[in-house]
């Protein structure tokens, strides 16, 4: 039994899905309206964003006591953000294959060692958004052509300064923050050497 299961009520009945309708569709996203009836009789319509239910990967490349991140334009907040290597899993790819491909496309590196940290949902109340997080080590140069509109800028952050990075208000990507905290928690030996 997981730690979280102690806090969840196994007897609690999930809401009944009464209807699902497409409210809008773009090239990348679909907005659905989902009519729900809860066990107490209350009915609500929720909206959810469905990016074709494609899962994604996020990769944390570590080399010589540094984490290699990327500076990339984020259209949501309309600014450049420091984030991790990431991208969608293509049809027929495993999460590991996608992580290896994204690493080569975005920062021109291949990893001899790729370790899964865990999978996270970015916003489960409103979308599928499953993200598989990996640590990449034993890196070497290996470039693949990607689909980015402009070159991503690799940024090396000393692991010894990760606490300062996580505490910096300018780092606003929740998935990146979660991945960095997972890295600290699951691989503490990387920080002892830093």
PLM ranges: what are they?
Residues 110-117:
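A short coil-to-beta-strand element that immediately follows conserved catalytic motifs
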Residues 20-58, 63:
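Acidic, metal-coordinating catalytic segment for phosphate/diphosphate chemistry
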Residues 33-35, 61, 135-137, 156-158:
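Short, well-ordered beta-strand micro-motif
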Residues 12, 49, 56-101, 118:
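Conserved Nudix-box catalytic region and its N-terminal flanking loop in Nudix hydrolases
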Residues 35-38, 123-142:
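Active-site-adjacent beta-strand/loop module that shapes the phosphate/pyrophosphate-binding cleft
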Residues 2-15, 52, 80, 91, ...:
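Nudix hydrolase/Nudix homology domain
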């Amino acid at each position: 039994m997981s730690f979280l299961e102690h806090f969840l009520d196994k007897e609690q009945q999930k809401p009944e899905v009464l209807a699902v309708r497409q409210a809008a569709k773009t090239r990348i996203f679909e907005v659905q309206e989902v009519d729900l009836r809860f066990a107490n009789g209350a009915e609500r319509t929720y909206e959810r964003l469905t990016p074709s239910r494609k899962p994604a990967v996020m990769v944390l490349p570590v080399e010589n006591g540094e984490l290699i991140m990327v500076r990339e334009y984020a259209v949501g907040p309309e600014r450049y953000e420091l984030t991790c290597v990431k991208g969608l899993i293509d049809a027929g790819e495993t999460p590991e294959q996608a992580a290896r491909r994204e690493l080569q496309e975005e920062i021109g590196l291949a990893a001899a060692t790729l370790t899964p940290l865990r999978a996270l949902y970015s916003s489960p109340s409103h979308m599928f958004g499953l993200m598989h997080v990996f640590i990449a080590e034993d890196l070497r140069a290996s470039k693949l052509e990607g689909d980015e509109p402009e070159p991503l800028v690799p940024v090396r952050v000393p692991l010894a300064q990760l606490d300062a990075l996580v505490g910096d208000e300018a780092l606003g990507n929740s998935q990146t923050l979660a991945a960095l905290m997972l890295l600290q928690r699951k691989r503490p030996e990387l920080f002892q050497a830093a």
